[in-house]
Amino acid sequence: VRDQADVLIVAGDLTNFGKPEEMEPLINILVRLRIPIISVLGNHDYESGRESDLIQMMSSVGIKVLDGTGYERDGVGFAGTKGFIGGFGRGMLTAFGEPEVKAFVKASIDEALKLERAMAQLRAPKRVVVLHYSPIAATVVGEAPEIHAYLGSSRLGEVIDRNGADLVVHGHAHHGSLNGTTTGGIRVHNVAITLLQSQEPSVAYRIF
């Protein structure tokens, strides 16, 4: 990888069940790549409630974990957060009715606000957004339509269009589509490894 790219981006789900003992062997592999690494966490990484421990483990070996934060390197700004579910376009859930629904929507809005803050930190001429959940519907096409609302949220795409970016990458939609654009025409790429390997079994990453 280091001969082909300047930085490696990991779009979440570094573990299956969010356990530090799962993270340790992955870190041992990543540090041997000898390339700068930028990551966000995915929903799997939250399963055991040990996400803070996972972030600490990654940070201790120099992996930059973005959680509503921005990072600049060699003239490129990276803004990232996990994102959240909530649906797309007219199918996006709104904060109406039961407290449980309002709490659900608040979590989605909070992640969009985290992305807004992260993007506001960037001053570099080139801007890359790193997410786990999708900001657009196009890159979840291929998944069962019944679960599209659980794969991302248009709220993230609205933030991206409002602030501007050159490239967006996300994971999570294992059987979605590789490429799409936001309403404003910004490129979005699904880099979920299951999807990549369904196209080419030997592929573990994409080059941009």
Model-derived regions: residue spans:
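Core catalytic region of metal-dependent phosphoesterases/phosphodiesterases
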Residues: 1-74, 143-145, 150-163, 192-193
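Short, well-ordered coil/turn segments that N-cap beta-strands
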Residues: 6, 35, 124-125, 186
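Structural motif
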Residues: 6-7, 76-77, 126-128, 167, ...
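Divalent metal-coordination and catalytic microenvironments
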Residues: 8, 13, 37, 42, ...
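Active-site environment of divalent metal-dependent phosphoester hydrolases
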Residues: 15-20, 43-51, 72, 85-91, ...
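A structural motif corresponding to the C-terminal end of an alpha-helix
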Residues: 33, 117-126, 159-166
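Conserved catalytic scaffold of divalent metal-dependent phosphoesterases
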Residues: 52-151, 192-194
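Binuclear metal-dependent phosphoesterase catalytic core
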Residues: 141, 154-166, 174-208
